Amino acid sequence: MKISKGTMDVLKNYSEINQSIVIKEGNEIKTISALKNILSRAVVKENFPKDFAIYDLPTFIGFHSTMSEPDFEFNDVSMTMKDGDGKGKYFYAEPSLVVTPPEKPIEMPESDIKFELKNDVLEDIMKKANVLKLADIGLKSCPKSQGLYLYATNKNNDTSNDYSVKVGDGATKKFNIVFKKDNLKIIPSDYDVTIANGISHFKNKDTNVELEYWISLEANSDYGE
């Protein structure tokens, strides 16, 4: 069995959310951060033949990157990677050592705060936030103009530099949603985003990839209720 580049990209992204992972039998991969404020689910091309855990996912990804197109064999306590004349063995971890997502899927509450997040817009905001050393990414409405704006700032600093870009129209109620920039660990793509009390849902718009994230919002978010 080979693991595709797309699946390795998912695992690389997941290693930024949690450095350990339990992969279940089948074609669905899920992860959750140690603080349980970021959760993600992906449906991949491969059907994994058994459950197994990886404790140090960055090391596993690095080991895989040293090979060209390895073939995987999943054994009882380890996996074997064959690459030409070379062969490597990587032992599974004890699953109980890994923080794992809940088995039951998250059901998002009803919400009228929805917008499309383009990848180039998010990249632009994140670049500006990094240059200006801004820790927070927000989504705010302007009922007067009915505009919806994504912005970067430091919420705890009244004299913070900031940057904003319009991402939608039709906002009829006032709200101001706040994320920690470091929590927006998503694979570059376009997303449909839904916001509800305390949580957000990012669903990938690429029909070739089933990928979604649930990310907690900051306590100082104002939902305009």
Where are these regions (language model features)?
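DNA polymerase processivity clamps
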Residues: 1-92, 111-225
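Long, charge-dense
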Residues: 97-113
